[in-house]
């Protein structure tokens, strides 16, 4: 954990795609770090980073961790059809990644942030934008309007332009 031990991480913001966040719960059980469990599908990484950065910035934690994991089969089971069903997938179907990522966030100026070259300077939280896409095989099409809206708000709110 970035050279830290469990006692140095005040809060863990983590989630996965399984019901009740079971992969997260079992994966971090032995760490005994206070957990804020998240369930946001593709947004879990951004959501956990946002919440952890707010906790650190507010002085609630000198050091917090953001963690996300995803598994292709879990998305199939939760949102489409279980793999055992053996349903035929259209060639244009979107796929869920199997992967995980973890980030340790620390307050600027803290000994934990020594040598860090990345800083969260602001966040833009998305909202539900529903154009009525109902095809579970094309989740990207369902998520695209909200993603576009969030990107637009990020650029507007922070006075930036697309490059």
Residue ranges and their predicted role:
Residues 1-4, 44, 52, 146, ...:
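Stable alpha-helical structural segments in soluble proteins, enriched in small hydrophobic residues
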Residues 82-153, 157-163:
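Condensing-enzyme catalytic core mediating Claisen C-C bond formation in acyl metabolism
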Residues 1-43, 162:
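Conserved beta-ketoacyl condensing-enzyme motif
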Residues 2-11, 58-68, 113, 157, ...:
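Structural signature of cysteine-dependent C-C bond-forming condensing enzymes
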Residues 43, 58-72, 78-84, 89-90:
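Glycine-rich anion/phosphate-binding loop at the beta-strand->alpha-helix junction
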């Amino acid at each position: 954990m970035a050279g830290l031990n469990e006692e140095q991480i005040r809060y863990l913001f983590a989630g996965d795609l399984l019901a009740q966040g079971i992969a997260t719960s079992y994966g971090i059980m032995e760490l005994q770090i206070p957990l804020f469990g998240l369930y946001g599908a593709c947004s879990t990484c951004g959501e956990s980073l946002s919440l952890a950065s707010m906790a650190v910035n507010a002085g609630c934690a000198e050091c917090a961790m953001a963690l996300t994991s995803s598994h292709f089969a879990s998305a199939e089971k939760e949102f489409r059809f279980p793999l055992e069903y053996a349903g035929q997938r259209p060639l244009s179907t979107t796929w869920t990644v199997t992967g995980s990522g973890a980030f340790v966030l620390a307050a600027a100026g803290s000994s934990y942030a020594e040598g860090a070259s990345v800083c969260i300077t602001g966040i833009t939280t998305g909202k539900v934008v529903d154009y009525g896409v109902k095809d579970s095989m094309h989740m990207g099409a369902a998520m695209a309007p909200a993603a576009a809206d969030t990107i637009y708000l990020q650029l507007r709110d922070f006075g930036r332009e697309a490059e």
